[in-house]
């Protein structure tokens, strides 16, 4: 990758960081204005999320506008003029170097390339990269940073609506006893985006692991299904979540998933569970 491309990526990253700082300052004054009925911590998190969303919108606008330093091209048009190999190098450089991550316009530009070529590239990066610190072959590198290349490729696949790897991704995810939260989040984004493909696979994984208490990555699988169910509720999803609630060792996760799903039938289940906890606590006391 040329120094020119690196300099352009760094400049847009610096601008993105400034936009985020401005948005956080803009919304920072509202953090103390907690609405009645809300707790301060949740409201602060909400305000920060809003600031980040506004930042992303501003960055997308910035990346689509003509830039004199790019010869009148927008950043997206600049990326479109590059070869796929150059884009791949830029994606990996951005993923591990830039504070703001890979530009959305670069993700979109790669996603518009020849489908098979992009699919092969993403498959190689996702398959060959470490998903745990133990798998990282270079101990001088930071796992969280190196994993960003996997996340970036998953983002490309989401942009392409290419979900042929859902089964393989979930098989590998389930092979670990435990993963970092940022790994689970990136997998969730891909799996939830592929709802029509993912639902039967997720339900099957849950059913296969009921007797083991749905611990470790199985907890994340239940969370993924619940999130899909929020947007696409169905009787099959509810029944699977109900079975998961009864089987999960960590009932807190189960309660959260049922609550997020939003089915009225979940309320008695949660009430009965809470009542049992109170009864057990009183008995032990």
Regions found by a protein language model. Name each.
Residues 1-26, 82-125:
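Short, intrinsically disordered, low-complexity segments enriched in Ser/Thr and Pro
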Residues 84-92, 114-139, 160-174, 196-209, ...:
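Amphipathic alpha-helical scaffolding segments comprising HEAT/armadillo-like alpha-solenoid repeats
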Residues 92-113, 137-162, 171, 181-197, ...:
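Structural detector for internal amphipathic alpha-helices that build alpha-solenoid repeat scaffolds
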Residues 177-178:
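Ankyrin repeat arrays, specifically the small/polar loop and inter-repeat linker segments at the C-terminal end
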């Amino acid at each position: 990758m040329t120094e020119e491309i690196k300099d352009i990526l760094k400049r847009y990253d610096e601008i993105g960081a400034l936009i985020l700082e401005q948005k956080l300052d803009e919304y920072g004054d509202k953090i103390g204005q907690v609405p009645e009925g809300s707790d301060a911590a949740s409201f602060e998190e909400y305000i920060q999320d809003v600031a980040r969303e506004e930042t992303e919108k501003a960055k997308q606008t910035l990346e689509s506008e003509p830039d004199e330093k790019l010869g009148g091209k927008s950043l997206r048009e600049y990326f479109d003029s590059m070869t796929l190999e150059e884009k791949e190098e830029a994606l990996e450089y951005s993923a591990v170097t830039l504070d703001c991550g890979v530009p959305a316009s670069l993700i979109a530009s790669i996603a518009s390339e020849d489908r098979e070529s992009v699919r092969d590239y993403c498959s190689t990066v996702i398959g060959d990269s470490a998903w745990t610190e133990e798998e990282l072959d270079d101990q001088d590198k930071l796992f969280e940073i190196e994993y960003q290349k996997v996340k970036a490729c998953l983002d490309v696949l989401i942009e392409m609506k290419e979900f042929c790897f859902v089964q393989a991704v979930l098989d590998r995810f389930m092979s670990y006893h435990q993963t970092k939260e940022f790994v689970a989040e990136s997998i969730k984004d891909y799996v939830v985006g592929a709802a029509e493909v993912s639902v039967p696979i997720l339900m099957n994984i849950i059913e296969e692991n009921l007797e083991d208490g749905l611990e470790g990555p199985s907890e994340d699988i239940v969370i993924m299904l619940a999130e899909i169910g929020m947007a696409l509720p169905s009787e099959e999803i509810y029944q699977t979540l109900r079975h998961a609630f009864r089987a999960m060792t960590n009932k807190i996760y189960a309660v959260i998933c049922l609550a997020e799903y939003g089915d009225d039938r979940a309320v008695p289940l949660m009430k009965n569970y809470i009542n049992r906890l109170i009864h057990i606590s009183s008995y032990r006391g």
